[in-house]
Amino acid sequence: GPYRAEPLEWREIATTALELARIAGILPAFLVDPAAAGEAVPVEAGDLAHWADRAQLTIATRARLPITACDSAEIVAFRSVDDTREHVALIIGTQRGDAVPLVRLHSECLTGDILGSLKCDCGPQLDAALAAMADEAARGGWGALLYLRQEGRGIGLVNKLRAYRLQDQGFDTVEANQRLGLPDEARDLATAARMLELLGAGQV
């Protein structure tokens, strides 16, 4: 529906509140009140910087995982102290330090990857990437699929579905996100870089 944007005098506070709301996953609806309301919980700039520090991301565990595309596959799970999302990498073929891997960064997409949605081509792209990596492994190389838990390009499943409703009204993806007060691009690609570093992939 229609909305009205109003400039704020306390822009820095609002920007920080927006970032905290994004981290908490409660966008697009929240209230910012500059007046004191009960006991305050102080948040320092360093707290946000600490949360965004991808050096905290570590390998939690790994296991052999034969898949349809390739019997020789391994899944690697990653965790960070301050982030509840668990990203995974799927290693196709035998990992070798002297071979540059075929890499795909794939953002989680429940509707496309699992449900076969026709609103996106995420599912077919995922299948094609795994097939290409299997071919690479058959030739003696290897591949790494980085599956990032960043649904809807980082805006979350519920907000993605809200954007779908707006798209049905004639708005494109960017316009729909903007009308919901969401960024055009919210994926965190630094996480993918850290995952590759932990996997020992110096080149892609």
Residue ranges and their predicted role:
Residues G1-V204:
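Catalytic domains of riboflavin
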